[in-house]
From Swiss-Prot:
It holds the Pfam family Seryl_tRNA_N. ATP binds at R262, S263, E264, E349, I350, S351, S352. This is Serine--tRNA ligase. Its EC number is 6.1.1.11. The keyword Coiled coil does not apply. The gene is serS. It comes from Oceanobacillus iheyensis (strain DSM 14371 / CIP 107618 / JCM 11309 / KCTC 3954 / HTE831). PROSITE patterns: AA_TRNA_LIGASE_II.
């Protein structure tokens, strides 16, 4: 959520920066009118309350002097009714303003490239060389099916499309990856491990920005108004909702493993086969709470921590700086890390690393004090995938496949695979 005071005082600047996102600014236009009405109502209400206070004093004086106070009492009642009417109008306007503020996306940082869509994203760096196979690379779903380590067909029978059974060495590979990632981030990158709930309430989804705008993308438990987590970012960020931290508490670094659930409402016909776009998938998530002045340095460090996973797995990748039109609702700046997928001869997203500045903290009420009695300030929050595990499995199956259909186990994973070097 943006700072309402900043929006009011810098309306044209905010409007211009949001135009770079390609956003519909209808809600922003409504803000100006409603905010003006709100301030007028507050002024009128304060004036009437002062009038009521004077009437109260007058009534007391009249009663002390044994004079007729009925006209003054009647006047005070009428003023009270006017105040009640204005208070109701004010409440209605403030509710509308809150919904508008919740629907306005974050402001892009000045370093974010201006552009319309993914075609305007800028490559920041590239690592590793794509494998040069002497045979035609198979897509990962064929590699996995031939090895009988992933079952897409039976998952479709049991649940439906975009679900999967891992089995045998496929399940072992998935488990090896999340243990490897959790160990790396906890032991080498200094994160505290978390295993969060997979179900969250509406306030949590609102705090991180999934609601109200993207409710159709979420899996909802209708009877309880609960939601399946789309990412561990939601429960872990809300771990400190409505809290005031001390300066010594920052930075806070949490790494969480969880299943993630997405409806993929806007993805009909895209990636209908394989592990790239599933309704349920496992992910390791990195969440940071930092002082505002540190957040952009932390974004670079966070992105490097996610990259380290791919480097140790020896998977070629590139880092893309997202343009304003492909930034997402909550991020002020975002990097996507994309891994090489040989069968598609392209890079595909495997991690997003974002700085939200105080956008989530303002929605979730997460603040800190620099001094014991100091004025609370909003923290800056950041998160990144470290990594999406299903997509990492896909990348390993494709980049490490051999002509005979077997798959080499990346060296760094072998201790997690009982020393196994080959799948097949």
């Amino acid at each position: 959520m943006l700072d309402m005071k900043y929006l009011r005082q810098n309306f044209e600047e905010v409007q211009q920066r949001l135009q770079h996102r390609g956003e519909d600014l209808a809600d922003l236009d409504k803000f100006g009118e409603l905010d003006t009405n709100r301030r007028q109502l507050i002024a009128e209400t304060e004036k009437l309350k002062a009038q009521r206070n004077e009437a109260t004093k007058k009534i007391s004086e009249l009663k002390r002097e044994k004079k007729d106070a009925e006209p003054a009492i009647k006047e005070m009642r009428e003023v009270g009714q006017e105040i009640a009417t204005l208070d109701k109008q004010l409440k209605d306007i403030e509710e509308k303003l809150e919904q508008i503020m919740l629907s306005i996306p974050n402001l892009p940082h000045e370093s974010v490239p201006v552009g319309e869509d993914e075609e305007d994203n800028i490559e920041a760096r590239k690592w590793g060389e794509a494998p040069n196979f002497a045979f035609e690379a198979l897509p990962h779903w064929d590699v996995a099916t031939n090895l009988d380590i992933i079952d897409f067909e039976r998952a479709g029978k049991v649940t439906g499309s975009r679900f999967v059974f891992y089995k045998g060495l496929g399940a072992r590979l998935e488990r090896a990856l999340w243990n490897f990632m959790m160990d790396l981030h906890a032991d080498e990158h200094g994160y505290q491990e978390m295993l969060p709930p997979y179900i969250v309430n509406r306030s949590s989804m609102t705090g991180t920005g999934q609601l109200p705008k993207f409710e159709e993308d979420a899996f909802k438990l209708e009877e309880w108004d609960y939601f399946m987590v789309p990412t561990a970012e939601v429960p872990v960020t809300n771990y400190h909702r409505e809290e005031i931290l001390g300066i010594d508490d920052l930075p806070k670094k949490y790494v969480a493993f969880s299943a993630s659930f997405r409806s993929e409402a806007g993805s009909a016909g895209r990636d209908t086969r394989g592990l790239i776009r599933q309704h349920q998938f496992n992910k390791v998530e990195l969440v940071n709470f930092v002082k505002p002045e540190d957040s952009y340095d932390v974004l670079e460090r966070l992105t490097g921590e996610a990259e380290k996973v791919l480097q140790l797995l020896k998977l070629p990748y590139r880092v893309m700086s997202m343009c304003t039109g492909d930034l997402g609702f909550t991020a002020a700046k975002k990097y996507d890390i994309e891994v090489w997928i040989p069968s598609q001869e392209t890079y595909r997203e495997i991690s997003s690393c974002s700085n939200f500045e105080d956008f989530q903290a303002r929605r979730a009420g997460i603040r800190f004090r620099r001094e014991a009695n100091g004025k609370p300030e909003f923290v800056h929050t950041l998160n990144g995938s470290g990594l999406a595990i299903g997509r990492t499995v896909a990348a390993i199956l494709e980049n490490y496949q051999q002509e005979d259909g077997t798959v080499v186990v990346p060296e760094v994973l072998r201790p997690y695979m009982g020393g196994k070097e080959i799948i097949g």
